Amino acid sequence: MALLYEQQGHVVTITLNRPEAMNAIDPETHRELIDAWTRFRDDPEAWVAIMTGAGEKAFSAGADLKKMIPQAFGSPGAGRSHNDLGLGGITRGMEIWKPIIAAVNGYALAGGLELMLCCDVRVAAEHAVFGLTEVRWAIMPGAGGTQRLPRMVPVAKAMEMILMGETCSAQEAHRIGLVNAVVPAADVLPTARRWAGIICERGPLAVRAAKEAIIRGLSLPLADGLRMEAFLSGTLRGTEDAVEGPKAFAEKRKPVFRAR
């Protein structure tokens, strides 16, 4: 299978499973990713997702150009229908407010980096390499790279990476805020799982509302963002979890949240 979908408790791990092709996204993988993200989004028992790549070499090298070119390139607008949901389903058009963790086990290039940019927190192996290299092949980032990267790192650095098509190391990615942590390769998935465990101990509805507030707020004036934050905060007050949290605090015990 081009994709592995595994669930342990409330944590889903989605693994790009084409290590022989640096986990590049071919049409089959693209379709399976759309199905996987839809399944994760709609499953009430799935609270956090981890996305990673099989093998030790690559998270993902992006679109498999050999297999994607016939349907995505060659004439103006050729790739529009193919990209309605964006590469892998999450780069455009699918809103997922549940948190997603990227466990970057190697190269994250072109569309692979764009997939990573859709994740909320990112841990990278020490040998990982990052880049939006599309201009080398006379194409441009088309799965959100030109929009998300400048929102995460200094604009000058985003310009450098995109216009020159150059790569950067894991250490540089951490320095500029592109990843949250850099760890030895053997610790990438354990770190992602530890983070997922921490998030699962928090109020799941509150976590989702907070993520939604952050993402939507990035494109809003501050006053509008504050109104949206107040609205989302208000929607939590009538939930069972919002009763359980303060009650557990008062009783000096660990809360038991049910996403209700």
What are these regions (language model features)?
Residues M1-E56, P70-G74:
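Conserved CoA-thioester-binding segment of acyl-CoA-metabolizing enzymes
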Residues A61-G62, H127:
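Conserved catalytic-core motifs of eukaryotic protein kinase domains, centered on the activation segment
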Residues T91-V207, A230-F231, T235-K247, E251-R253, ...:
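Crotonase-fold acyl-CoA enzyme core
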Residues I14, R18, E32-L33, M51, ...:
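Terminal peptide-recognition signature
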